[in-house]
A protein has these predicted regions:
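Catalytic helix-loop patch of NAD(P)-dependent Rossmann-fold dehydrogenases
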Residues: 1-33, 45-46
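Hydrophobic "lid"/C-terminal helical patch
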Residues: 57, 85-89, 113-116, 144, ...
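C-terminal "lid/loop" region of Rossmann-like NAD(P)-dependent oxidoreductases
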Residues: 68, 96-99, 107-114, 121-139, ...
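Non-catalytic, hydrophobic alpha-helical segments
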Residues: 81, 85, 101, 112, ...
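Amphipathic terminal alpha-helices
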Residues: 158-179
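Glycine/proline-rich active-site loop of Rossmann-fold NAD(P)-dependent oxidoreductases
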Residues: 14, 39-52, 59-61, 66, ...
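Residue-level signal for the nucleotide or nucleotide-sugar donor/cofactor binding architecture
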Residues: 7, 11, 44, 48, ...
Length: 179
C-alpha cells in the first residue's frame, strides 16, 4: 500500500524505513525492515486496546469502544513477534526487504471486546463513545506471508493468547496483593 504519513507517528515510521533503506544503498549494509502490527502480551501498557479491555473485564468495569466497533484490527502475540524478528535476523531470508510482523486474521473491536468479556467471565458492559475523528484507520491488516515463513509453528490463535494474558494478569495481581 502507498505510504501516507497521516500523523507524526506514522510519518516517523516511514522516515525510519527510508533511513534504513539509505544505509543499504549508500554503504551496502544489509537491512531487513520489520513492521510490527498490534503486538500484545504480558507487561504491555494498559494504553493499548488488548490490555485495556482485559484489565477492564477482569475488574467488571465498562469497556469503551469508539463508534460502532466495526473497525478491524489484527493481533500478534509477543512470542510470535520475537520468533519472527529473531529468525529474520539469523536466517537472512529477507535481506533488503520488508517483513510485516503481525497476524492477518481480522477481528472487529466490538468482537474483541465481546470475546474478552466471555473469556474473563466478566460482568463488564460495552459502552459506545462517539467515533474518533476522520482519518482514524478503520482497518489494519498486514500481509503476513513473509512472517509465516519465519515461524516454525502457526501463529498463536487469538483465544489462546488472550487466555494466556488473562492468566498472567490474574497471577500478577495475586502476587502483588500477597506482598
Amino acid at each position: 500500500h502507498p505510504f501516507q504519513g497521516q500523523s507524526p507517528y506514522s510519518a516517523t515510521k516511514i522516515g525510519a524505513d527510508r533511513i534504513a533503506e539509505s544505509y543499504f544503498r549508500s554503504f551496502e549494509l544489509p537491512v531487513t525492515i520489520v513492521r510490527p502490527f498490534n503486538t500484545y502480551g504480558p507487561r504491555q501498557s494498559t494504553d493499548f486496546v488488548m490490555s485495556k479491555f482485559i484489565h477492564a473485564a477482569l475488574n467488571d468495569k465498562d469497556i469503551t469502544i469508539y463508534g460502532d466497533g466495526s473497525q478491524t484490527r489484527t493481533f500478534c502475540f509477543i512470542d510470535d513477534n520475537i520468533e519472527a524478528c529473531t529468525n529474520a535476523f539469523y536466517q537472512n531470508k529477507f535481506v533488503n526487504d520488508v517483513v510485516n510482523i503481525g497476524s492477518d486474521i481480522e477481528i472487529t473491536i466490538l468482537e474483541l471486546a465481546q470475546k474478552i468479556i466471555s473469556i474473563c467471565k466478566s460482568k463488564s458492559k460495552i459502552v459506545h463513545l462517539p467515533p474518533l475523528k476522520e482519518g482514524d484507520m478503520t482497518r489494519r491488516k498486514p500481509d503476513a506471508t513473509k512472517m509465516r515463513e519465519l515461524l516454525v509453528h502457526d501463529l498463536t490463535p487469538l483465544d489462546t493468547g488472550i487466555k494466556y494474558l488473562v492468566e498472567h494478569y490474574i497471577k500478577r495481581k495475586k502476587l502483588t496483593e500477597a506482598e
